[in-house]
Amino acid sequence: LVCFVVVVFMAAAAAMAGADRELKYLSHGGVDFPVPAGRLDGVVSR
């Protein structure tokens, strides 16, 4: 059972790494889009 969990975890990690590598390739090295800063609920911190 433990071996199965390790194999599934490694497969998931490999899939995520592949997706990340593909995104970097398709976006020519970087993804650039604006991200709003600050709190989304409108409250201003002191």
UniProtKB/Swiss-Prot annotation:
Coiled-coil region(s): none
Keywords, alphabetical: Calcium, Heme, Iron, Metal-binding, Oxidoreductase, Peroxidase, Secreted
Cofactor(s), names only, from the UniProt record: heme b; Ca(2+)
The protein's role, per its UniProt record: Removal of H(2)O(2), oxidation of toxic reductants, biosynthesis and degradation of lignin, suberization, auxin catabolism, response to environmental stresses such as wounding, pathogen attack and oxidative stress. These functions might be dependent on each isozyme/isoform in each plant tissue.
A cellular component term, taken from the record's GO annotations: extracellular region
EC numbers on record: 1.11.1.7
Localization per Swiss-Prot or TrEMBL: Secreted
Reactions catalysed according to its record: 2 a phenolic donor + H2O2 = 2 a phenolic radical donor + 2 H2O
GO molecular function, one term: lactoperoxidase activity
Protein name, entry field: Peroxidase 1
Cofactor comment text: Binds 1 heme b (iron(II)-protoporphyrin IX) group per subunit.
Highest taxon listed in the record's lineage: Eukaryota
Keyword Metal-binding applies: yes
Family: Belongs to the peroxidase family. Classical plant (class III) peroxidase subfamily.
